[in-house]
C-alpha cells in the first residue's frame, strides 16, 4: 500500500496558505466599498450579483434604491475611467460637479421626475448653470451643456458616456446620433432584464419584481422605497438581441461589463460590422417555467385578475435542476406527482448546518409551486416516454442490424462510408419534435440564449440611393450635380467638426482670432462697490478699499493668466489656470473654472467675463444676483501710503477669520489682490512678494495664521506660542510686537500694566485684603516653574486669570460671582477677543480666560474636563487657575488636579482652597507609596510564621503585616556613593542591616544597628533607616516599613536581591517594587576602569577616584578574597562570599571565580557587580574557568589595542563643539501647532502619494552570480506587518521587511552580484584626491582613541563582553552578521519598490571593531586636520559653520551627485585605495593585510542563511563612514572639474559642491567604466544634502518635507519608549528651526515644488507632535510576496 498521499508536506501547505492569503489580501485591497445601509437580504443579493468582486460594507448613508445605485456606481466608474474627456448623455444633476472631464452634456427639458431631480441638484459650480436653465427654461449659459437631447445635439466629441439614458432610443437612432456628433465610441449602461423577452405578466426573482404589461416594463428591486424603472419593452428587446447596426452608419455593439442584468455596452462605429454572437445571461440564477393556465388564456370572467398572473415563473436554477434530477432518476413504480410535490417542498426550505448552507431554499407563491409541479411532472413524463420509446426502438434496430447477412454488411462497408461530417448517432432519427408542441418543453433557460441580430440604420437609404443615381445621370448628361444642395453636418477638421477635442483631424483648422490682454491696468477700489456689496463686506473694510488703488500687470499665455498686483509697497502674484484650487476658510473646496477662449471664469456663486476694449479691459461681474461692468484703464496707479495698505490688509484678515468662525461650510478666503484686482474675488496661486520675504508678514494673508488681531494688545497676548516667558519673581515679560507692520508703521502701544494701582475703568481692586500683603501660601513648586498655592487667585501676578465659568459665560455663583464683582466688564461677550472650544478670552478690563468645566452633577465627562484646561493654553504669558469644576459642579478634586497637571504650561499657578489643600498635603507629588495588598500581606505573614519557628527568627513571633499604604524615602546610588555615611545619628533611631558585618560597621560609628529578625523588637514607632534594603527578606522589610514612624531606605537596586535560602517560593512573590526618590551617581570608591565595566548597569556613574586601572588578571592573590559560593569559601581560608561583602569597602581584593559558580554568575550579574565594586586601589581576578569573561569582564580590548601597535598618549578629542541656536529671531513662534491629519493629507496631495495597499513587497529573488549561498530548510515568512503610525500614507520607499525570503533576496540581489574588477594603479586617483585630502603623514593610534571607542560602546549599551582575544582560528573573532534593513528612504516618487531587493546592515565582530576602530579614528582626525577650509567632512563640523559657508557663496550653483548601488559597485580598486591610505598613515602591515583579507573574501551570516562572497562593501563595518566618504571624495575629485569652487561637503555617498560651473574630467571615463560606477549629477540653484536644503546665499536649512515624510514611515510602537524617542527627535529638529522657520517655508517649498502653505502646515504639525499631542493609528497591512525561486550557480 502506498502511503505517500498521506504524508504531510509543510512547505506545500504553507505555500498554498500564503497564496490563498495573498489572494484574499489582493481581493480586499481591490474590493468594492458598499456605503448604504442594507438589509440582510439586500446584502445577499449584492454579494451574488457582484461575484467574483469582493465587497467591503461600510454603511454610512441611506439610499432609496441601494442595490441599483451600487451597481450603477461600479459601472459608472468603469465607463468614466475608459472614456476620458467625453460627451455625456442624460447626466444625473448630482454628478455634474464631480466630473470635470466631461466636455458637453446633453439633456432633455425636464418633465415629471426629472423636475424633482433638478430641484435637488447642487446650487454651486457647473451644476448651478444647468439647474438654472432647466428650471427656468433659459438658454444654456455656455457650450458645456444643452437641452436638445442626444438626437438633436451636434456637439462634436469622439467618445461618449450614457448611464441608463438610452432606454428610449432604438439602436438605429443611436447610430444616427453618434454620426451627428462625430462619435466613434459610446459607453452606455443599460438595464436589460431577461423577463422582457417573455409574455406579459408579473415576474418575481430573488433580486427584483418586474411587471410586464406588453408595452412597458416596471422593475422594482428588493427593499426599494421609491418608484422603480419604467422602460419600453420593444426597445429593451431590441437592445438585448442586437449586436450590430448596418446601413449608412454601421455600429458594433459589444457587452464589455455585466452585473446581473445591468450591462455596459461599448458601441463602436465600424465600417463593416462582423457577426458577434453573444450569450447575455450566462450567470442567470433563474429558470422561467411556463404556466399552462395563465393570462394568455381565459380562466375566468374577470380579465383584470389575469394581469397579475404570469405565463412564466422565475424558479431558481438549483431548485429546477435538483427537481428534474430527482424525477428523472426515480424508479418507474415510485414515480408519481405526490412524490415530486413532497421533494419540492423539502428543497424549498432553507437548511443551515453551522456555517454551511446545506439547502438554499426558495420562497415561492402558490401559483409558482403549481406551475413548477405541473411543468416538471409533464416534462418528466415526456422524458420517460422518450426513454421507453428509445430503448424499444433501439433494441429493434439492434436486432435488425445483427440479423443482417453478409451481402448487406458488404454493401454497408463498400457504399456507406463515414466522412468528416459524420457524427455518431446521427444515423438514428427516431423522433422529431415541433417547437409548438407541448413536448418541446415547459421552461426557458436564459443561460442558453444566444443572440446575433442586426438592425438597419433608420436613414433614408433608398431615397439617397435614387438621388445618387439621378446625380450620376445628370453628370452623364453633362449637367452640374445637385449634391451640393445637401446640408452638411457640422464636423471637425476636414469634416468640419466644431470641437477641437475631436481627435482624428488631418487638416489644420483655421486659427481663431486671439484676445491678448497683456499689459498694466489701474484698479480703483471705488469702481468695485457692487462686487463688495455682493460679497457682503463690512463697511469699514469697503471704506478702506475705496481709498486704495492698485496696478495690475497681466501676462497672458496659452490658457494662463499671470497677474502681478502692486498695492502700495506690497506686491502679490496670482496665476489663473483652469482647475486652480481657490483658498477657502472652511471644509468646502472650490476650483476655478477658467476658459481663456471664452474669456470667462467662475467658481461657486461668482462668475465673470472680460474683453479688451478701447478704454482698457472691460470686466463683467455676476455675483449673487448682482451684475456690474467695470472698465479698467491702462497705466500705473499712484502709490498708496504703506500705513493705509497695512491697515487694509489687517482689516481684511480679521474679516476672513470672523467669517471662518461664524460659517459652518466656510466661504472664499479673500486676499488683498482678490479685492483690488482685475478679476475679483479670485486670487488663485496667491503669493506675496517682498524684498525681505522672511520677515513673517506674508503669513498674515493666508488662512494658516491663527491669531485674531483687533488691537496690538491682542497680538501680544494671544497666540499659539508654546514656551512661556521666564518667570523670576515678578510677572513674566510678554511679547507685544506688531502683527502687521512695516518700516513706516508706528510701534504699537505696550501691554498695559494690570498689576499696579492704576487700572482701567470697570476694574475693581484685585487684592482680597486692604493692606495689600499677599496671604497666599506656597505648597509645591514643579521642575518647570509651575507653583501651587493655597489662597486667593486674585493675589496672583500672572498675566491671565482663569475663571470657572458656565457654558453661556453669564455671571454665576462661587468663584464666577467673585470675578463678576471685581471685573463686571469681563462678561461682555461683545468684547471677547477669541474663543477656543468653550473657553472665551477677554482683555477687558484685564486678561481673563473664562473656562468651562463639565457639570458632574449631570454626567461624568473626563474628556470635557481635560478640554477645559487645554482650551486655556492658547495664550502667551502665564495663567493662574482655580480647580475647575471642583465647586458647584462637584468635580472630584483629584480629577481636576490631575487634569491641570497634564495641561498646564511652565510658570503657571494653581490656587487651592483649604479643603483642597488638605487633600494635596496627603497626596503630595514626589512621595512614593507602597501598597500592601491583602495577598501580599497574607504571603508575608506566612513567611513570618515560618521564620518564627527557627532559632534566628524567634523575635518575629506574633508579628503581623497588615494591608495598607506605606510611605517611604528611598535613596539609591551607585556602589561607594556614600549613602550610608550621609546618615546622621540625630536623624535616626534604629538602623536595620542584612548582615552581621554591616551591623558591626554601623555600631562602630555609634548607631543602634540590628539584623532584620532582631530589629522586630525595636522598630515599632521609631525612625528607621534600612541599609541595603533590596537585599533584605521582603516580609521583614514590609514589617519594619509598616511599624516605623518614618522609614528611609538605602541601597542599590542593581545589586544582589534577597535570596530564598529555604526555597519556600515566598520571597519572589512578596518582593515589593521600590521606587527610588533620589539617585546618587558619583562614587568615591570605584576606580575608572571599574566604572566603565559597570556602566551598562549604571549609565550615569562618575568617580572621584584618581586610579585609572585597578583590574589585573593572573597575578598572585592580594588583600581580601571574594568568592561566590560556600564551597569556594571553605576551599579558600580567609575569604568571604560576595553576598557577605555587600556594603563593605576594601583597599585591595582578589576575586576567585570557581567552576561551581557558573550558574550563579550567569543568572545574576549583580554578584559580579558587587565583587568588582568592593576595592579602592587594586583588584586581582583569578578566572580560570572563564566565568567573568562570559559576562563581559575581560581585558581583551586593552590587549588587542596594544597588539595592533597602539600607544599611550593624547590626541585632540573627536567631539565637535556644538551649541543650541539662541532665540535671536524666534520666527518659529509665529507657527502655531496645526492638525496632524490635515498636514499629512496635504503632503500626500502635493506629492501624489496614496495609502499603500501593502506594507512591503518581497521581490523575486534574482540569480546568484558569484559566491555560495546556504539556505535554510524552512522559508517561513510573516504575511502582515503591524505598525503604530501617524498616518496611513507613507512617503518613504517600502521594501521587504525582516524575514527569510527578504533576507535571501537581499543577500543574492545586492551582495551575490558579480563584481566588476578594475586592475589599475592608484597614483592618479590619489593625486586627484589630494585636492581635498593632502598626503597624510604618520598617524599613531593612542589611548585617547581607545577611550573614545569604549565610550561609544558604552553609549550603545555594550559592555565589551563580545570582545575576544585575537585568535583568527575562532569564527567568533571574524564573524560578519547580516541584518535585513527596512528601507525608509524618503522619496517623492513611487513608495512601493516593486522588483527591487532590500538593503542590508552588517555588523563585524566586536573584536575586529575594537582592533581597527582606534586606528580608523586616528586616521579620521588626521584627515580633518588637513582638510581645506571650504571642505566639510561627514558631520565633523557645527551646523552653523556649514550654513555660514553656504550663505557666503551667494552667486554659486549647487552640484549634487547621487550614487546608485554605492556599496555594491565597490571592488578591488576601492579596497586597494583604502589600503594605500592605511600604509601612507603608517598602520602595521599585518593589520593592513588582515583588513584586505577580510574585505576581499567574506561570509555574511544571517540568522538562518549565509553567503560566501567577494569584494562587496558592507555598510556596517568599522570605518564605514570614513572609507565611504574617502571613496566618494576620490570619485568626485577624479571625475569632475569645478570652476570657482567655494564649498564642498561629503558624507558617505552624499556630496554637494558649490561652484559656478563644472565639467567631466578627461580621465573620468576609464574609472567610471572600469568600476561600473553609476553617477547621477544634478546642477541647480538649490540642492539637497544629508537632510538639509543647501541654498546659496541663505545657508543650510533643515529639510522639513523630508523629515516629515520620514516620520510617516516610523513605527511609534509597540512601547511608549519608542514614541518618546521619536518625540524628542522632533523637538531637536524644531530647535534647529527656531530662527529660520520662515526661510524654510520659502526655500523648501521651491526645491520640492510644493506650496509654501504645505511647509507651514508641516511645521505646525511637528510642533503638535513635539508637544506630545500626536494621534496614532494601528494598522495591519499585508505583504505582497512575489518570490518564486532562488537560482544559483556553482563557482
UniProtKB/Swiss-Prot annotation:
Residues 1452-1563 form the RdRp catalytic domain. It catalyses: RNA(n) + a ribonucleoside 5'-triphosphate = RNA(n+1) + diphosphate; GTP + S-adenosyl-L-methionine = N(7)-methyl-GTP + S-adenosyl-L-homocysteine. Residues 1081-1214 form the (+)RNA virus helicase C-terminal domain. Residues 60-240 are annotated as: Methyltransferase. It comes from the Viruses. PROSITE patterns: ALPHAVIRUS_MT (PS51743), MACRO (PS51154), PSRV_HELICASE (PS51657), RDRP_SSRNA_POS (PS50507). Residues 710-776 are annotated as: Hinge. Belongs to the hepevirus non-structural polyprotein family. This is Non-structural polyprotein pORF1. It comes from Hepatitis E virus genotype 2 (isolate Human/Mexico). The lineage of its organism: Viruses, Riboviria, Orthornavirae, Kitrinoviricota, Alsuviricetes.
